[in-house]
Amino acid sequence: DDADLDAYFKYLENPKSLKSISPSGKFYQELGLDKELVNSFVNIEPGADQGGSSIGKAELFLSLFFNDVGNSEGGIDPETGEIKKAKGDNNWEGVGNLEVKGTNGRLGQQGGRGLDATDTFENLAKDLLSDEQLKEFGDRFFKKPWTMSTSIAELYKLAMQNKVPETKIQSKINKALDVVYFNQNLANDYFKTETDFTDLEEITKNLLKLNAASYSKAKGIDAILFVDTAGGENRYVIVNKSDYDKTIDNKKFWTTTKGPTGFQWTNVNPNLVVAKD
């Protein structure tokens, strides 16, 4: 209504920068504006840009409310006619390409549409287990989409029992994970010690760190903003790529499944949500 528009235009007289607000919180509180006004802008979905990239919720809001954020548009090369995809969703001044993820956003393709990594997992097990172990392991883990954390921990234990050198076990698992996560060769940065491969909570944290870092490296992304576009409170968390590990350790964003079960070999890029206060 007119009052909301007046409040918005008044805000534009002295807009905030994205860098100036808390790295996590609620947008309407940080901006000092009515919650419904902010929600109405967060929920705008303009469609696709010239390059065919979908402009999702909160992307336009960021460029309209923060003076250091602009739209990151795809386009057509005037010389070649080639369609160029935008890197990230917004340009964040002084930071780089900002990716925006709404409720249930993924750092990769949706399950069933992207990579099904079950073949990679089965080949990994064949490399590390005896025939007898493989049959029992396959009966448990190949016939339904078992979680990555549980299956990695069990595979590690059985491979050790099979007298496979620990360095080889770790190397084989990490190579398989690098295939799954955009071939960026970052798994060794996260999976280093026995605990990294056997503790279900640590495995899940490491998978999320690897997913975020590899996705960002592959896509040229410098920061990610997660925003709850479904709860009506516009809760958010902003994460520079240098802070992914710390933010994930603190579970500021996490899989929709609270336990260490969100990653599956048939769904290696699970839905993610902003943590509640």
Walk through the language-model features, giving the residues of each.
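Active-site beta-strand termini and strand-to-loop segments that position acidic
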Residues: N90-G96, V100
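Short, positively charged
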Residues: D1-K85, V100-D277
